[in-house]
């Protein structure tokens, strides 16, 4: 009788914990929302994205703020940000940027930067 009770308890535990494990496993490598887009680290990444875009495109965008964002843990962290910037005309526009950051290697790379449109992420 005791072994049946132990077996049922273990089986119940597996049934309860298995969905939690599967849920956590599905998030590994997935995108997670950034709860505080005013965090200095997030703002620094946003400023880097605009600055790097300006260097590559010989543009003159001026960073304003990070509107929203997500992170993805890879070999480092991918930041997918919607940033507001203007090109000096006084009109703020949103841009989508992806930055790969590996702070322990002092490595940061702008992977993508484009005008935001309603059909995309964020």
UniProtKB/Swiss-Prot annotation:
Pfam families reported in the protein's UniProt record: SQAPI
Motif stretch (Secondary area of contact): 72-76
Molecular function GO labels: cysteine-type endopeptidase inhibitor activity
Entry keywords, A to Z: Glycoprotein, Plant defense, Protease inhibitor, Secreted, Signal, Thiol protease inhibitor
GO terms under biological process: cellular response to heat; defense response; positive regulation of seed germination
SMART domains named among the record's database cross-references: CY
Subcellular location: Secreted
Leader peptide range in chain numbering: 1-26
Glycosylation sites: 36, 109
Cross-referenced InterPro entries: Cystatin_dom (IPR000010), Cystatin_sf (IPR046350)
CC annotations in GO: extracellular region
Positions bearing the site annotation: Reactive site: 29
Domain Cystatin, first and last residues per copy: 29-117
UniProt protein name: Cysteine proteinase inhibitor 5
Species of provenance: Arabidopsis thaliana (Mouse-ear cress)
Gene behind this protein: CYS5
């Amino acid at each position: 009788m005791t072994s049946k009770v132990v077996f049922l308890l273990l089986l119940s535990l597996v049934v309860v914990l298995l969905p939690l494990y599967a849920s956590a496993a599905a998030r590994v490598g997935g995108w997670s929302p950034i709860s505080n887009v005013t965090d200095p680290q997030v703002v620094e990444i946003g400023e880097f994205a605009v600055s790097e875009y300006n260097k590559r495109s010989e543009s003159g965008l001026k960073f304003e703020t990070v509107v929203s964002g997500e992170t993805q843990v890879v070999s480092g962290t991918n930041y997918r940000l919607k940033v507001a910037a203007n090109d000096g005309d006084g009109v703020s526009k949103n841009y989508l940027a992806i930055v790969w950051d590996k702070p322990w290697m002092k490595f940061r790379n702008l992977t993508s930067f484009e005008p935001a449109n309603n059909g995309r992420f964020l």
